[in-house]
C-alpha cells in the first residue's frame, strides 16, 4: 500500500514539474539565416563585438574541430563562421555544425587541418561564411570562402554576402515559360530547356557530362550574352584548369577587358566541408547578378552528386545515423534548401545546368533520385548509346522536359518530337526480332521504319566545338528552325536514298546531303 502511494506521488510530482517547465521554458523564435546579422546584433550589440568573442581549439579529428568558449552565453550560432589565424598570414575558416555541451561547438573545417594544435585561438565572425560578390568576381577563380586562387590579386567586391540565405518568397517568383535554345539538336527537339529553369544532366562515369556542359557554356554563354557562373564541385582539377584556359581562348574570360563568367572551385582534393559548401558559394555569386543587377544568369554546377557525397561525409564525421545506402538522413532537406534558391524572380533569372553523376548507372540511387524532383528538364546520357559511337550520348526516350507542351512549343514542334520518339521506340521493340530472325523477316513497313529510325539515331549525333581537338570535325551549332526542318524531311522520306553514314556527325540536313555527295564522289573515284 505504502509503495503504491509513493509511486503515485512520484508520478504527480514528475507531471507537475514537466508542466511547470513547459510553461516557463523560453521558446526561441525561428530565425532565417538571412537575418543572421540582425540576430547577432541582438546578442552582441554589433557584428564587430561578435569578432571579439574568442575561444580555443579543444580537439581536432580530421576535418572536425571542437572549439571551446568561455561561457555558454557567448557560444557562436549554428552555421556561424569561425576563423583561425595560421602562419604566413593565412586563415582557416570553420563552420559551426553542432553545440555539444560544456561550452563547446563542433565545427567543420573548410580547408586542411594539418598543423592545428589544441589551445590555438579561434575568433567568432558573428555571421555565416561571407564571400565577395559583384562585377569584380567576373573573370576570377574563387574558392569556397571567397578567396581568389588565380594568383591575380584580391577581388574587388561590391559587398560581401553570406552563403546561407532564404529562397525567394512565392510572391517574388516568376513562372512565365520560355525556351532556352542550346544549338544541340537532340536537346532542342526532344527535351528542350526552360529559361530560368533547372536542368539535370544524368550519366555514369565517362559518358560525356563535362564535355556536354562545356559545349553548353560555349553555345549559350556566347549567344545568351549575359553572365555565367561555373561551379566545380568535387571534380577533377585538370578539367577546371582546361575550362579556364578555353574560356580565355574563346573570349568569355578576358584578363584585361570585361569578362562574362565567374568561376568557383572546390575540387576533388578539397576537404568534405569545402565540397559541401562550394555549390552555395557559386549560387551566392549568381544571386547577386539576379537580385541586384536584374540579370539572366547561367549557373553551371559540375557535379551536384559531389555536393551530396560531401554532405554524406560531413554527416558521418558528425556522428549522425546514416540513411539508405549510407547517405545522410538530411539528404532531401540539404538538396531542397539549395535547389529552391535557384529560381526565376520578377527581377531576373538563374538558369542552372547541373551535371549529376549516377553511381553504377543506377538512376534509383537516392542521390540522383532526390535531384530528379527539383528539375524542369532531365537529359540522360546513356552508356549503350555512347558504345554505338553516337555523341552526345543523350537517350532520346529517357530524357524529359516539362516544356514539352504544344502551348509552349507550338503544334509542329510538339508533334514532330512525338513522331521521332515513336519511331525510335518502334525500332527498339523490333531489335529483338532483328537479332533473332534478321531484317528479311520484317514486313515492308517495318523495314522502312527501321531504316529511317537508324538514320534519325545517327542524325541525333552532333560534332561539338569543344571536342574538335579529339574528333577533328568542326563543331556545329544548329538553330531550332533548322532542327525541326531537318527531322521533318527525314520522317517524310525525302532523304531515303542517302546512306546511313551521311547522317552521322553532321549539323543540319544540308550538311548530311553534302556529306552524301562527298561519299558518292569517293566511291566513284
Swiss-Prot record:
Gene3D superfamilies: 2.40.10.170, Bovine Mitochondrial F1-atpase, Atp Synthase Beta Chain, Chain D, domain 3 (1.10.1140.10), P-loop containing nucleotide triphosphate hydrolases (3.40.50.300). Its EC number is 7.1.2.2. It catalyses: ATP + H2O + 4 H(+)(in) = ADP + phosphate + 5 H(+)(out). It comes from the Eukaryota. ATP binds at residues 203-210. The keyword rRNA processing does not apply. One of its GO terms (cellular component) is matrix side of mitochondrial inner membrane. F-type ATPases have 2 components, CF(1) - the catalytic core - and CF(0) - the membrane proton channel. CF(1) has five subunits: alpha(3), beta(3), gamma(1), delta(1), epsilon(1). CF(0) has three main subunits: a, b and c. HAMAP family: ATP_synth_beta_bact (MF_01347). NCBIfam families: atpD. Belongs to the ATPase alpha/beta chains family. This is ATP synthase subunit beta, mitochondrial. It comes from Schizosaccharomyces pombe (strain 972 / ATCC 24843) (Fission yeast). The gene is atp2.
